[in-house]
């Protein structure tokens, strides 16, 4: 027995390692530490936006990484007066009403006769500036439209980081206001919808801008489209929560899930106004959220193809608007490649491939009228860009207005 035990102990002491080959070796993609999508987005933005914005980038960067400010878009179909009183009690202010006061003050300063065709000459705040007659008329009409806007959106003052409470339902089951990035209303205001217009919202979901279009109370007919059926379902829910049934009847509002790139073939030269709020890198979301992040490795190809998709959607929108109608292109990205470059490329393609001639419209008056609420980047070649700032943490929001001539 003792001999057997001694033999076993010797075997244990004399044991050695043996190497085995496995059928598969571990892949490097599963063994390397995973970098969060938000970190990848930040690295990408640091490389690109530091070159684009220079010394402004550190300020924009910290603002993007900080909690966003919201605006409360008042539901005109609810008990508006009660809602206005409640929001005013929170020390919030209607930024659109404040802009209208600025316009009124400028008209008074320049002794403008509002009964005649308004021409802003020698405006000290350079709302119109040195423009030809056509551009002057366009700027004047846009300011006049802003003065008469029925949209109401409350925001807290610069530096005030208060939050709005969740909206409540009124006695008819409609929510009182919609919380959104207040800068998202600027493309809707730029669209200058007049009474009786037919309007196309080409990429409508999740529904904030679509709701704002209906709140103008000027849309005779609104077509709201989004390729994603799940996002279209969310759009349905938003409209059901804020808009009475008779105001979203089939002859007034149509919701579809078609490929927006085909709209120029489906309904060419049909609409008075078209909003093209395209899919983009959604810069703020990409920095703060991991879920559904465009910077996920499996979505690399999709992200790289964004400028092409955006260009195709804008060309489709330009074809869908009638001659004399207007298109507003917008993104929630700071990227010059997704903003100005897309606009310029779409203008070229629309002309060469489809014979559609368009002209960018001057929106510089927005910078002056809304400067108390938003921070604007001053060096866009076309369009306007709201950049986040710690005291006014809205955006990013790029928007550009295009007039179809032919």
UniProtKB/Swiss-Prot annotation:
PROSITE patterns the record matches: SAM_MT_RSMB_NOP
Chief location of this protein within or outside the cell: mitochondrion
GO CC entries: mitochondrial large ribosomal subunit; mitochondrial matrix
A GO BP annotation: mitochondrial RNA catabolic process
Cellular localisation: Mitochondrion
Residues annotated as binding S-adenosyl-L-methionine: 207-209, 226, 231, 259-260, 277
Family (UniProt): Belongs to the class I-like SAM-binding methyltransferase superfamily. RsmB/NOP family.
Protein name: 5-cytosine rRNA methyltransferase NSUN4
Source taxonomy: Eukaryota, Metazoa, Chordata, Craniata, Vertebrata
């Amino acid at each position: 027995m003792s001999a057997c035990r001694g033999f076993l102990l010797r075997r244990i002491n004399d044991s050695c390692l043996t190497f085995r080959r496995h059928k598969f070796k571990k892949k490097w993609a599963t063994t390397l530490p995973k970098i969060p999508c938000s970190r990848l987005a930040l690295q990408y933005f640091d490389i690109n936006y530091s070159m684009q914005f220079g010394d402004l980038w550190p300020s924009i960067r910290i603002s993007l990484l900080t909690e966003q400010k919201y605006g409360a878009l008042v539901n005109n179909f609810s008990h508006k007066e009660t809602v206005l009183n409640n929001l005013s009690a929170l020390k919030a202010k209607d930024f659109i009403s404040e802009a209208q006061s600025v316009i009124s003050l400028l008209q008074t300063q320049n002794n403008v006769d509002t009964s005649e065709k308004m021409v802003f000459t020698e405006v000290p705040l350079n709302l119109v500036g040195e423009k030809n007659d056509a551009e002057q008329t366009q700027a004047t009409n846009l300011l006049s439209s802003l003065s008469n806007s029925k949209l109401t959106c409350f925001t807290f003052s610069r530096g005030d980081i208060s939050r709005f409470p969740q909206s409540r339902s009124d006695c008819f089951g409609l929510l009182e206001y919609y919380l959104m990035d207040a800068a998202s209303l600027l493309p809707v205001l730029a669209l200058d919808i007049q009474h009786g217009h037919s309007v196309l919202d080409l990429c409508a979901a999740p529904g904030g801008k679509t709701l704002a279009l209906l709140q103008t109370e000027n849309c005779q007919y609104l077509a709201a489209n989004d390729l994603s059926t799940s996002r279209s379902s969310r759009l349905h829910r938003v409209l059901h929560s804020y808009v009475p049934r008779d105001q979203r009847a089939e002859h007034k509002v149509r919701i579809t899930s078609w490929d927006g790139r085909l709209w120029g073939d489906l309904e060419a030269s049909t609409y008075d106004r078209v909003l093209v709020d395209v899919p983009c890198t959604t810069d703020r979301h990409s920095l703060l959220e991991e879920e559904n992040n465009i910077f996920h490795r499996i979505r690399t190809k999709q992200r790289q193809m964004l400028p092409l998709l955006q260009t195709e959607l804008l060309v489709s929108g330009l074809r869908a608007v009638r001659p004399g109608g207007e298109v507003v292109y917008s993104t929630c990205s700071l990227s010059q490649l997704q903003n100005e470059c897309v606009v310029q490329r779409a203008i070229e393609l629309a002309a060469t491939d489809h014979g559609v001639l368009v002209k960018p419209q001057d929106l510089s008056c927005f910078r002056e009228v809304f400067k108390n609420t938003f921070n604007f980047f001053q060096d866009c070649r076309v369009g306007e860009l709201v950049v986040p700032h710690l005291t006014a943490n809205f955006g990013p929001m790029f928007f550009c207005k295009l007039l179809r001539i032919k």
